[in-house]
Amino acid sequence: AVDKSKVPWWVSNLIVPLVNLTLALLVSALFIFIAGENPYQAIKLIIYGSFGYIEGFAYTLYYTTNFIFTGLAFAVAFHCRLFNIGGEGQAYIGGLGVFLVAINFSFLPVPIVWILSIAGAFIFGAAWAFIPAYLQAKRGSHIVITTIMFNFIASSLMVYLLVDVIRDMKQMGPHTVALPKELWLPSFKDLAAFFGIKIRYSPLNASFLLAIAASFFVWFLVWKTKWGYEMRAVGHNTHCLLYTSPSPRDPH
């Protein structure tokens, strides 16, 4: 086995992701070739569509934002050696919390509504994650199975709510009432215009910057705080619970 502590940081943070990306492109090229198309042209279009022009790059960052948030949710649990596969469902319910708070407290000043909405996302998402966490700790249910199942439950619940409960009846499709525009986060188009860059419409907004900030926060939490040390210690050795918790319980 390889001692990860002796592996240079640039190997794990640069070389390994680059190798993984290269292998993914090679496998994709193989299947494209089997399908009878030109792998070079297909991959060229993929790269150009993702990074070749500013609107495409903005869409790439827009879709990346969701993966950053759900990836961070997975990473925190993973440091405890727990596999939280329920990031998708927790994001659904967290988004529901944002909407309910924002729509019901829209009369308050915008900064306060933003703060309350973020708190609503925390509470709703954490409450949804608490159920499989409780089943794991108290009943021994496998957290991978329960979190995956809760993704489907959250998806079905959101469909029901969007169609029958919080739907805007003035709309043909399952849409909620639009939040007041003053509550919307600044868009990438507006941010680019501030720096004199003109682009067409893009769904990317300041939530990407929040995702980057959250990444630094999670890094600091895991590696620079006592709580983070306790999480990592528990993940590597459950006996450490005897020293880090007044009421220890084996999370595995």
Regions found by a protein language model. Give the residues of each.
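Membrane-interfacial amphipathic/re-entrant helices at transmembrane-helix boundaries
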Residues: V2-F69, P111, L116
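Generic alpha-helical transmembrane segments of integral inner-membrane proteins
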Residues: L18, T22, L26, L30, ...
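Membrane-interface starts of transmembrane alpha-helices
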Residues: S12-I15, V19-N20, P109-A121, H142-T146, ...
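Hydrophobic/aromatic residues within transmembrane alpha-helices
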Residues: N38, C240-L241
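Single transmembrane alpha-helix segments in multi-pass membrane proteins
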Residues: L30-A35, L45-F105, F122-S141
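Transmembrane helix-bundle core of multi-pass membrane transporters
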Residues: I54, I143, T147, N151-V222
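Single conserved hydrophobic/aromatic residue that forms the stacking wall/gate
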Residues: Y243-H252
